[in-house]
């Protein structure tokens, strides 16, 4: 399959649009089990997975995302995993004194070069911040096969901030508020964050930390709707190199991918939907078309409401002009055109202009009266 720009460098424009909406990402480690879970919430149904093979210089990896093939999440051959949350833009100090970064997104460099969270943090701070994206509108969560994890975001001071998972058994969660600066948020407090934490707290030992339990967390925080929908979910078993994929918040069918086997295939990409049964795809399509139909109806209703408002505004304007407003026909035609284009907002502009004329006329009349009295 041809994957377009899959193996090219990432532009600033692509990077600024790369991180989708209300994703919920979490990782946990207990004993010898380390898992990483993600719900990809967005509007683009064209989802893919693809493979970067290993080389003498780079680790191979399996990645997930959309048809622009910007990395949204993934796992490399060493078990290092990542995903990202969208945030409002934040300031990031450029550090021009540092070496120039590679001509790719910093996370892609990390996934090629790092095996652990410690190595990822070292790479993150090594270069100028050019390849983080301008403006900086996201945070990333990274976890490795040892159980270490970190959320990297912009701190209040404009420096990279590293929110670490506690050492040993435990968990780390990332949604759409900045873990180092909660004021930088799309939603805070975040119900998805609170729900995920509530469920992760119930894990007491390694026997509780299972793929099925992670799946239940993903299900409990998934989204449905025309504006933001859980398009796919993934669970990475980092110790065993296994990917569990779910399509369109349907958690009753799972596809398992072996990371090592996928990397051996070389450069490769495939639609996520093509991995699943016709029944699962039919359900997803029916839901998608249902949302699209509702959006079309809503747009039509909005168009009718707007036309009614424009017509009403035009009637009010013509009535006012006919009452004897002292303006030329040319000015009247201009106001008619303004109201046709801008509806009630144009009418509001007319009234503001009319009031201004009245005030000017009253002021001139007062001055004339004062002059006559002298």
Locations of regions flagged by a protein language model:
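Bacterial N-terminal signal peptides
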Residues: 1-7
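C-terminal, well-structured catalytic/ligand-binding subdomain of enzymes
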Residues: 14-22, 26-112, 136, 143-290
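Intrinsically disordered, low-complexity linker/loop segments enriched in Gly/Pro
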Residues: 104-122, 126-132
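Individual transmembrane alpha-helix segments
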Residues: 291-305
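Selective detector of the "anchor" transmembrane alpha-helix that sits immediately C-terminal
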Residues: 301-319
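Amphipathic, cytosolic membrane-interfacial segments at TM-TM junctions
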Residues: 318-338, 362-363
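Membrane-interface alpha-helices
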Residues: 325, 349-374
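Hydrophobic, aromatic-rich membrane-embedded alpha-helical segments
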Residues: 333-356
